């Protein structure tokens, strides 16, 4: 674990771990701790009231953040014929089939998102052991296996984030960058929370949205009062 800077240690002393902060105050504290020379990511951890060990309580999906992520997303698409042309027109960085699969097998993967037309899964399916561990395997549940490859490409380029609850029942995601103003960060977090609520499993009991905390890439986490998140 990276050592905390003097400024981060001082801030850690200012943050009350038992307190729920209004979103604006939480973000102000997080930005104060973001001392790296690069434009740090502002991240969120959402504790959900689910048992992620049960298959019917795995929360997974994708949402387009209205204000983007502040990052340029490189998109690869497995498609052929008309679908390949649609993907290129929508702005895909790499489009192919067997040639793209060969590139992946060679370890050449200059992309952040992989999208596949349904008829391309015969090729993509052979790449599971490579793409899966990297979180790149296309999946219909998050809209990356779809006949509408153009929309999928546009969504990825517009700032779509994929989310999946981990074994501890927590969803981790970015909501922007330190350079974003509070309104943009709040709008992005509100969109993520809305998507999580829509993805709530029918079998989830009790309080669903349990804890929300924001942090920077290298900073401390600050708990947020969920009543102050709505954009």
UniProtKB/Swiss-Prot annotation:
Keywords, comma-separated and alphabetical: Repressor, Ribonucleoprotein, Ribosomal protein, RNA-binding, rRNA-binding, Translation regulation, tRNA-binding
Gene3D superfamilies for the chain: 3.30.190.20, 3.40.50.790
InterPro entries for this protein: Ribosom_uL1_bac-type (IPR005878), Ribosomal_uL1 (IPR002143), Ribosomal_uL1-like (IPR023674), Ribosomal_uL1/biogenesis (IPR028364), Ribosomal_uL1_3-a/b-sand (IPR016095), Ribosomal_uL1_CS (IPR023673)
Segments forming a coiled coil: none
Keyword Ribonucleoprotein: yes
Swiss-Prot/TrEMBL GO biological process terms: regulation of translation; translation
UniProt-recorded Gene Ontology molecular function terms: rRNA binding; structural constituent of ribosome; tRNA binding
Residues spanning the membrane: none
HAMAP family assigned to the protein according to its UniProt record, in alphabetical order: Ribosomal_uL1_B
Quaternary data: Part of the 50S ribosomal subunit.
Designated name of the protein: Large ribosomal subunit protein uL1
Organism: Acidovorax ebreus (strain TPSY) (Diaphorobacter sp. (strain TPSY))
Gene name of the encoded protein: rplA
